[in-house]
């Protein structure tokens, strides 16, 4: 019998689940809106209902066909005990997600930080395959980070290692959900780029952004890049400012860890080469090891939006 696992990518905007095999192949997947805020128990039921419907719609039975369920969650995650100690974007603390979900599923459930799950996927089968030192930075609702250092996942004390979204890159800057000001994710997340794009649209009714997206509520990172590529000055300024902040945070990480590879994931990474072409010159200028023979490579995560699903499933594989 083929071994199959469910991987769940628990995001602030969407919950995505997929059925995955040992090699990281996704057989099927499905997603629903997270619709925060809500009580923990309600979100747990949403996760279960999503996985149950995914299996039923594709001819699988959770009890008989699935080995385990892996959850990739933002925040400080104790993978050994299956507890999310803190998740500022969800507003949860001491969330005993493993224990609670196992009661619903009736099979083993494992939980890991979502960015750690994503770097596991990239190291095992993605664009960091074969690396002993690699990072992933996910640009979504917030900014997440995962590190594979000297051949193993780095969790840190209190399971709060690589919360890169909460390094400060702008003193006394924008207020973050964590309580600090000027955090990386307030400037470099997909949400930040969306917010800045919408602000620019309000300030510049003449911008091409309006022609590409007449409904400002639907404006997002893609719209900003599309307008920039068409020569719109307003969009170009928005994107260039975003890139400067993103490069600032990435160079800080590169100078601390000197990884072989930094993988970029999350919604903004869908811009692929356009994103890399803007980033690389700034990083080349600021990287402390810019004169070294071997340089850190900035790449788009192979699995991109699927990295969370595959990585979460691989957490289950590692515990099988």
Model-derived regions: residue spans:
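Short beta-strand segments
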Residues: 9, 68-74, 136-142, 146-148
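Structural signature of FAD isoalloxazine-binding scaffolds in flavoprotein oxidoreductases
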Residues: 160-163
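ATP-binding/phosphotransfer module of carbohydrate and carboxylate kinases, centering on a glycine-rich
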Residues: 1-68, 78-81, 99-107, 121-131, ...
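Conserved A3 ("GATE") glycine/threonine-rich loop of ANL adenylate-forming enzymes
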Residues: 14, 117, 141-144, 171
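Catalytic-core segment of enzymes that process non-peptidic bonds
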Residues: 148-149, 153-154
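General beta-strand structural signal in soluble alpha/beta enzymes
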Residues: 109-113
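A charged helix-plus-loop insertion that forms the helical arch/lid used to bind
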Residues: 82-93
